[in-house]
Amino acid sequence: LDNHLGWVFTGVLATVFTGWLFVQFGVPKMAEYVAKITPPEMEAKLGEQALAGLDSQYGYFSPSKTEAAHKASIAVALGKLCVAIKECPHYRLEFRGGGVIGANAFALPGDIMVVTDEIVALSKNDTEIVAVLAHELGHVKQRHAYRQSIQGVLSGLILAAVTGDVSSVASGLPAALMQMRYSRAHETEADMFALVALQKTCLPPHAFADILQRLEAQAYDGTAPNNHNPKDKAK
């Protein structure tokens, strides 16, 4: 038996290493392919379910208390940017109280963009919010949230196959979306979309940097969430 332990150990290491390679490189490619062939209706349904889960089941969000007039001015400003650049994807803008999430804006599958009251309050003007949303539009355009969610599910299924716990894969998706970190390539794509959009509409790019610096200051104070790291976005 002792003579075979080395081979067994080597086989286990090879299996683990192969699995790691598949998760790191194979799963993202599979997620990209699945996203391309998925009907938009299916992605939209996933986004609706994720938002509903975040609203109720997980209690991340509360109804927005931002004044209706302020919401409208942000929506109009973002609409003007999209009209000017003519490259915006279809999107749906949602306002929520951030609760434990705090000051943030992010994309969900199905072209949904969520803006929290806290980041609206943190901004000094609508231009800063539009700059942040231009970045999120980059994620929407490239379907990054959906691709990341598929990647998470595929990785979860692999883990479930090992542990035998399948139920956690579906039930944990909304929470997983809140902890999701885009790859550096995805962030770069979103940053470039935002930069081009701001330049085409003659909006100052520093508006994006200014609000991110305030978000970063909050993070150092422990009052901002640790997901969607502002410092990473600023880079």
Regions found by a protein language model. Name each.
Residues 2-235:
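A Zn2+-metalloprotease active-site environment signal
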